[in-house]
């Protein structure tokens, strides 16, 4: 990845709220299935905004920090996804998204961020991200002191 896109907590909450507005009315949804781990925080934010209490997870491992590797399904929510929102933080190459579509063909699949290769696989997203850009999510960072350039 040549570029980095840094996401703050404030930005994430604003984007999640925008996505939640598009998912109204909330009564049409039985629940949310969050893709672990990237979709856990967006899933919680959507659940809050939409007043949804039924939240489940599907646990798919496909990243090791900034390296993609073979996909492994660790745990899945039951059913075909009918009436459920499946949420992940981003769709990148589409590997995870294809697995989600196979597992939950009737779900409404959403992400906060979408890269071009995976964009056609989601039903909705908020922000376009170039394919060669790595997204630094707020849960992967911490605030630290940065000394002034002058050293004074």
UniProtKB/Swiss-Prot annotation:
It is an enzyme of class 2 (transferase). GO terms for cellular component: cytosol; plasma membrane. PROSITE patterns: PUR_PYR_PR_TRANSFER (PS00103). It is found in: Cell inner membrane. It is a peripheral membrane protein. Belongs to the purine/pyrimidine phosphoribosyltransferase family. XGPT subfamily. One of its GO terms (molecular function) is magnesium ion binding. Purine salvage pathway enzyme that catalyzes the transfer of the ribosyl-5-phosphate group from 5-phospho-alpha-D-ribose 1-diphosphate (PRPP) to the N9 position of the 6-oxopurines guanine and xanthine to form the corresponding ribonucleotides GMP (guanosine 5'-monophosphate) and XMP (xanthosine 5'-monophosphate), with the release of PPi. To a lesser extent, also acts on hypoxanthine. CDD domains: PRTases_typeI. Xanthine binds at residues 92, 135. Its EC number is 2.4.2.-, 2.4.2.22. Keywords: Cell inner membrane, Cell membrane, Glycosyltransferase, Magnesium, Membrane, Metal-binding, Purine salvage, Transferase. Homotetramer. 5-phospho-alpha-D-ribose 1-diphosphate binds at residues 37-38, 69, 88-96. This is Xanthine-guanine phosphoribosyltransferase.
């Amino acid at each position: 990845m040549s570029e980095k896109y840094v996401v703050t907590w404030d930005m994430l909450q604003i984007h999640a709220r925008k996505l939640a507005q598009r998912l109204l009315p909330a009564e049409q949804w039985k629940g949310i299935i969050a893709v672990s781990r990237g979709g856990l925080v967006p899933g919680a934010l959507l659940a809050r905004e939409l007043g949804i209490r039924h939240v489940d997870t599907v646990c798919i491992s496909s990243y090791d920090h900034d390296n993609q590797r073979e996909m492994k399904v660790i745990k899945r929510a039951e059913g075909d996804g009918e009436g459920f929102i499946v949420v992940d933080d981003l769709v990148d190459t589409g590997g995870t998204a294809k697995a989600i579509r196979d597992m939950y063909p009737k779900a409404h699949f959403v992400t906060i961020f979408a890269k071009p290769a995976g964009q056609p696989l989601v039903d909705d997203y908020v922000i376009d991200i170039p394919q060669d850009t790595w997204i630094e999510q707020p849960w992967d960072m911490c605030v630290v002191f940065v000394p002034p350039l002058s050293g004074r």
